[in-house]
Amino acid sequence: MSTGLAGILFLASLVIALVAVHVPLGDYMYRVYNTAKDSRAENVVYRLIGADPKAEQTWGAYARSVLAFSAVSLLFLFILQLVQGRLPSALTDPGTPMTPALAWNTAVSFVTNTNWQAYSGESTHGHLVQMAGLAVQNFVSAAVGMAVAIALVRGFARKRTGELGNFWVDLVRGTIRILLPISVIAAILLITGGAIQNFHNYDQVVNTLAGAQQTIPGGPVASQEAIKDLGTNGGGFYNVNSAHPFENPTTWTNWIEIFLLLVIAFSLPRTFGRMVGNKKQGYAIVGVQAVLAVISWSATLFFQLQAHGTVPTAVGAAMEGVEQRFGVANSAVFAASTTLTSTGSVDSFHDSYTSLGGLVLLFNMQLGEVAPGGVGAGLYGILILAVITVFVAGLMVGRTPEYLGKKITPREIKLAATYFLVTPLIVLTGTAVAMAMPGQRAGMLNTGPHGLSEVLYAFTSAANNNGSAFAGITVNTEWYNTALGLAMVFGRFLPIILALALAGSLAQQGKTPPSIGTLPTHRPQFVGMVAGVTLILVALTFLPMLALGPLAEGIH
C-alpha cells in the first residue's frame, strides 16, 4: 500500500469516527449544560468555593469570574514551580533550572490552555508538579473555554435578559461530567496501547544492548496524555511530546490521540444547534469547520508527500523529523489537526516540515483556530466569524444583518471586529519587536526566511494558545519567556472578554422573526460564505509576513 493511500485511509477512519460521535456527544453536552440538577460531587465543590449554583451572572460578572479563577490558578502554579525543590517527588538534579521568568511563562502557558513549553518536561518537573499543577490546569483551562462558548450560545438563545448562566456551574460541570469521564476511558485505552503509567523516578539507569547506560524517565504519563489531547492543551510529559514512545507508542495510540484532540470541538456545534433550537444551524457551523479542516489535511499531506531533493526523492516523501513508526502521512494528519485545534502537541518535528507544509501549519493557527479550534474557543470563534459574515452579507443587500433572530447592530459588529483584530496585532507586533532586537536575533539558529518563520510561528502559537513550535530559536530567555507569556495572556483573555460582551449584548435583544429578506444561515451557501470570509480575513492580515517567510523559502 502506498504512503498516500495509507494516509487517506487513516484520515477516512478518523472522519467516520468523528461523524459517529458527533450527535451523541453533542446531545450529552447539551444536557450537561442545560439541566437544573447538580450531582453530590458538584454540590460539594460549590460549597468549598462558596458559589451559589442557582445564581445567574451578567456578562460582566461572568468575565470577572473567569479572570479571577485564572489569576488564582496562575499564582498557585507559579509558586508551586518555584518551591518544587522542597516538595515530595521533586527531581534531585533538574535539567532546566526553574527561574521566575520560566515559572511565569509555564504558569501562564497552562492556565491559558496554550501549553507552550520552554523546558524539557521530564527533566524539569517532578511528579507532584506534573499531577497537582500541570494536569489540573489541563482540565480546568479546557473547562473555562467550554464555559465561555456555552455563555455565548446562551446569548443567542435567550432574549431580553442580561444573564448568561453561572461560570462556576459551567466550569464544574464541564470538568466533572465531560472531561473527567472521557479522560479516564482514554487513559485506559492509551495504557492498553503501551503508554506508561507509573511513579518511577527520573533517575532509573539501565544497561543497553550496546553496553552503554541510559536514563529511563518514568511517570504518570497516560493519565496526563489523555487530558492533554482531549482538552486541546498539548503540553507533553516528555520533551519530544507525542513523538516519545512512552506517550504515543503505536499507530493505534496515534489515531486515538488525534481523535481525542478533535472530538469535543467537532461535537460542540451539535450542542449549539440544540441550545438555539435549530439543529440545522449546528450542522452549518460544523460544515464550515469541516471544509476548512479538509483543505488543511489535504494540503499538509500533499506538501509532505512531495519528493523534492535527493533524499526525499529516494524515500518518496519528506522524512526528516518524522517518527518511523508513524510515517509521513499519519504525522501530517497529526500536525494539521494539532494546529487546526489549539492543542499544539506534536508527533513529528514541525521545524523539519517542507516550507509549504510549515506554511499550512502556520495558516491553520492564523485562522484563529476555528476549524474546529480549541475546546470551547473554536466554537465561540466560529460563531463570531458567522456574525461578521452576516454583516458583510447585509451590506451587500442593504438590510440590517440578523443571525439567529438577533440584529447585528454597530455595537455587535464593533465587538466582533475587535475580537479578530486582537490576535493579529499581538502576533505581528511581537514578531516585529523580536526581529528588531539584535539580542533576540542572536538566539535564532537559522537566518533568512526560515528564521523569520520560526519567530512568526512562536508568536502565532502563543497568541492563538496553541503551544507548538518550530523550535529553531532559543526561547528560554528572560525576554522570550516574558514576551510570549504576555502574548498568551492577551491572546486568551481579551478575546474571551469580547466574546462575553457580545453574548451579553445579544441576550438583551428580543427575537426578530425571519422575513423574506433574511439570509438563510443553515444552507451550503452560508457555509461557503463563512469559510470564504475566514480565508480572506487571514490572507489580508498575514500574507505580507507569510510572503517574507515560508512562501519566500518555498519559492527559493
Curated annotation (Swiss-Prot):
The keyword Transcription regulation does not apply. It is found in: Cell membrane. It comes from the Bacteria. Signal peptide: none annotated. InterPro entries: KdpA. GO terms for molecular function: P-type potassium transmembrane transporter activity; potassium ion binding. Its main location: membrane. It is a multi-pass membrane protein. Keywords: Cell membrane, Ion transport, Membrane, Potassium, Potassium transport, Transmembrane, Transmembrane helix, Transport. The chain crosses the membrane at residues 5-25, 65-85, 133-153, 176-196, 249-269, 283-303, 377-397, 415-435, 483-503, 526-546. One of its GO terms (cellular component) is plasma membrane. Part of the high-affinity ATP-driven potassium transport (or Kdp) system, which catalyzes the hydrolysis of ATP coupled with the electrogenic transport of potassium into the cytoplasm. This subunit binds the extracellular potassium ions and delivers the ions to the membrane domain of KdpB through an intramembrane tunnel. HAMAP family: KdpA. This is Potassium-transporting ATPase potassium-binding subunit.
